[in-house]
């Protein structure tokens, strides 16, 4: 099939599950980056959840074939690239310290990834459309606000209470 010999297949993939994982990862990354704009990210995220729920068996097969840290790192990297593109789009000429910029990217990346994992851990029970809408409502304007806060003001100091370090 497809002109690939068994020897060539096993040269690149030790087993069929490795191939399935590779295909899954490529499709996910391509999909995420195709919607890596402030205007489109939530539509893309919703489509991703719908895709994963429509391909539930394959999704859980791939997710369970990887270690927890591998799957977390995969989604973190993919969504971080999306968030980096969104920050690039929104920041314009806003002067940001690189460490603060990275913190903003990480914060919003981790928020989306945490919701994705919570949804997967709850057996995809939440409706993808409602979940995405709820995330989008909370995040709408928050990224631009974070950029503005970090560009014009120093982050507020932490309030330390007596007896804390």
Give short role names for the model-derived ranges.
Residues 3-6, 10-36, 46, 53:
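An amphipathic alpha-helix adjacent to DNA-recognition modules
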Residues 6, 37-53, 140-143, 148, ...:
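Primarily secretory-pathway and cell-envelope proteins
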Residues 42-57, 106, 110, 114, ...:
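Amphipathic alpha-helical segments that line or abut small-molecule/effector binding pockets
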Residues 88, 118-165:
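C-terminal peripheral helix-coil segments that are non-catalytic and often amphipathic
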């Amino acid at each position: 099939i497809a002109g690939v010999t068994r020897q060539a297949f096993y040269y690149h993939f030790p087993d069929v599950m490795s191939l399935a994982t590779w295909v899954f990862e490529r499709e996910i990354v391509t999909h995420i980056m195709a919607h890596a704009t402030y205007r489109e990210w939530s539509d893309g995220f919703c489509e991703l959840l719908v895709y994963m729920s429509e391909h539930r068996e394959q999704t859980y097969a791939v997710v369970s074939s990887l270690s927890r840290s591998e799957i977390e790192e995969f989604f973190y990297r993919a969504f971080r690239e999306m968030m980096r593109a969104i920050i690039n789009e929104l920041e314009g000429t806003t002067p940001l310290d690189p460490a603060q910029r990275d913190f903003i990217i990480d914060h919003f990346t981790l928020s989306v990834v945490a919701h994705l994992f919570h949804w997967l851990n709850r057996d995809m029970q939440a409706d993808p459309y409602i979940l995405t809408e709820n995330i989008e409502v909370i995040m709408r304007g928050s990224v631009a606000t974070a950029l503005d806060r970090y560009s014009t003001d120093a982050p507020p100091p932490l309030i330390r209470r007596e007896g804390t370090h």
